[in-house]
Design a protein with these regions (language model features):
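Acidic, polar-rich low-complexity tracts and alpha-helical solenoid repeat scaffolds
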Residues: 5-262
Length: 262
């Protein structure tokens, strides 16, 4: 196929209208090799149903999936790479297609402030890839992607809990920080989460009706103990001790009042 034909707009339009499957396929591969993924993808999309049963079909489908990836159509590339490795599980491209599905989903993962459904899907596919290809040459890159996605979920979980705290929804904040600590025990946000959980519990107790205060102050005292055990050198230690002292004083007063009433 002539370079002149590939390089001209009229030549490309003629290829689109052509019914010569072999000529179209040859042109699509040449466009692909030149890095013109839009034209290659357009031709390959037309060719795929026409190549069924032919040896070129496998390469055409893999290349078509990659044209979508190279054009940053990550949702589509994830779909087509999955379709490829499901259709050709024994292909020489199968492992790379599985990897590229995972990479497409990784690229399609949104900022942490947004819904993270795609992130969870990406992590699931990455784990499936590692289970299937434990010795893969892509292993280090895939593990790096997984760690980055986990950090994104970690940040979302922490900022979500922090938002409850900032909005003064203290009960929800305590619940969210507890879930965060359980889900991410080694998080770099751990110290801040533990302190804000204590602070939220103290404020919750302080703002509670009288018959719930003692129980909630005692919970704040328990959170203080956990905090100083885990972070004895914390820069927030002085403020934590202040809340502890106030909680302890409040509990002692309530106990004294209860004894006097009896």
């Amino acid at each position: 196929l002539s370079t002149l034909l590939l390089g001209s707009c009229s030549g490309y339009q003629k290829l689109l209208k052509s019914t010569d499957v072999n000529k179209k396929y040859e042109a699509a591969i040449q466009y692909y090799d030149k890095g013109d993924f839009f034209k290659a993808g357009t031709l390959l999309e037309e060719l795929i149903p026409l190549l069924k049963g032919r040896p070129e079909a496998e390469k055409a489908q893999f290349y078509f999936a990659n044209t979508n990836y190279r054009q940053r159509n990550y949702t589509l590339s994830a779909f087509y790479f999955k379709n490829f490795h499901d259709t050709y599980p024994n292909s020489e491209y199968a492992q790379e297609a599985y990897f590229m599905q995972a990479k497409s989903l990784f690229k399609d993962s949104p900022e942490y402030q947004l819904d993270q459904t795609n992130t969870y899907t990406a992590i699931e596919v990455i784990q499936e890839f590692l289970n299937r290809y434990p010795e893969s040459r892509f292993r280090a890159e895939v593990e790096g992607m997984s760690q980055e996605l986990q950090k994104k979920l970690e940040t979302k979980a922490f900022t979500g809990a922090r938002l409850y705290y900032d909005l003064r929804y203290y009960q929800s904040a305590v619940t969210a920080f507890t879930g965060f600590q359980q889900g991410y025990p080694a998080s770099p946000y751990g110290e801040q989460a533990a302190f804000l959980k204590l602070s939220a519990q103290y404020d919750l107790a302080h703002e509670s009706v009288e018959n719930k205060q003692q129980e909630r102050y005692l919970e704040a005292i328990a959170f203080y103990q956990s905090f100083i055990d885990a972070f004895p050198q914390s820069k927030s230690l002085k403020e934590a001790e202040r809340m502890y002292d106030l909680a302890r004083t409040a509990v002692d007063k309530m106990k004294t009042a209860g004894t006097a009433a009896n």
